[in-house]
């Protein structure tokens, strides 16, 4: 299938809020350390005034915070989800299947990913490095995709529909019962990883083009 529309829409959703793309990678790298990230820390890394950090985060309504106002989740999260993302013996979590395939390249770490088939509950797992996926179990694993909607809450509009499945046939059967989702498609986990790699390439190009 043609994945270009999904890449374009993902990039559009990330860039919809001015500054989100620039904030994303530093934030992910800090969250990958396994502890909450303060706005002051983020402002220092980005060399932004505190007001700019606050303005971008205010529009990124999916962002998760602890009781002290520190960031604990944006795609990668310290709160438990169905997508376990283990790096350097630290157990983190992701919002959706595609996040687990995208983030290793952005944070420069290999992750051991485990989850469950969204249709059957069967366990699924794989190892995701910045450049490849390995140890895919079961081997025929699939991923569901939808086109991101124009909504501030990307988690609700996109991530909640992007799952792992034990096989393509299982995923296609699930998709037949969820035809109301715009742009719903089923791809192999290898195709989904390729989409993630292409997304990362475009995202990093966009960031470098804005670097003075």
UniProtKB/Swiss-Prot annotation:
Catalyzed reactions: an alkylmercury + H(+) = an alkane + Hg(2+)
Q: Could you tell me which InterPro entries the record lists for this protein?
A: MerB, MerB_HTH_dom, MerB_lyase_sf, WH_DNA-bd_sf
The protein's superkingdom reads Bacteria
Which key words tag this protein in UniProt? Lyase, Mercuric resistance, Mercury, Plasmid
What GO molecular-function term can you cite, just one? alkylmercury lyase activity
Q: Which GO terms describe its biological process?
A: response to mercury ion
Any signal peptide, and if so, which residues? none
Give EC number(s), comma-separated. Answer: 4.99.1.2
Classification via Gene3D superfamilies: 3.30.450.410
* Broad class of enzyme this protein falls into: lyase
The record's family statement is: Belongs to the MerB family.
Function comment? Cleaves the carbon-mercury bond of organomercurials such as phenylmercuric acetate. One product is Hg(2+), which is subsequently detoxified by the mercuric reductase.
Q: Can you say what this protein is called?
A: Alkylmercury lyase
- Species whose genome carries this gene: Escherichia coli
């Amino acid at each position: 299938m043609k994945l270009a529309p999904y890449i374009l829409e993902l990039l559009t959703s990330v860039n919809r809020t001015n500054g989100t793309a620039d904030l994303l990678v530093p934030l992910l790298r800090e969250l990958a350390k396994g502890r909450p990230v303060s706005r002051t820390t983020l402002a220092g890394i980005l060399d932004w005034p505190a007001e700019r950090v606050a303005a971008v985060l205010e529009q990124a309504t999916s962002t998760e915070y602890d009781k002290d106002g520190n960031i604990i989740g944006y795609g990668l999260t310290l709160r438990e989800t169905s997508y376990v993302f283990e790096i350097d013996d630290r157990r983190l979590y992701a919002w959706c299947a595609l996040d687990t395939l995208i983030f290793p390249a952005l944070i420069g770490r290999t992750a051991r990913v485990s989850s469950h088939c969204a249709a059957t509950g069967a366990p699924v797992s794989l190892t995701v490095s910045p450049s490849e996926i390995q140890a895919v179990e079961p081997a025929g694993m699939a991923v569901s995709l939808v086109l991101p909607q124009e909504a501030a809450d990307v988690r609700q509009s996109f991530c909640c529909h992007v799952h792992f499945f034990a096989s393509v046939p299982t995923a296609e059967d699930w998709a037949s019962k969820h035809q109301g989702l715009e742009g719903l498609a089923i791809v192999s986990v290898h195709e989904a990883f390729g989409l993630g790699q292409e997304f990362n390439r475009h995202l990093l190009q966009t960031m470098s083009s804005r670097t003075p």
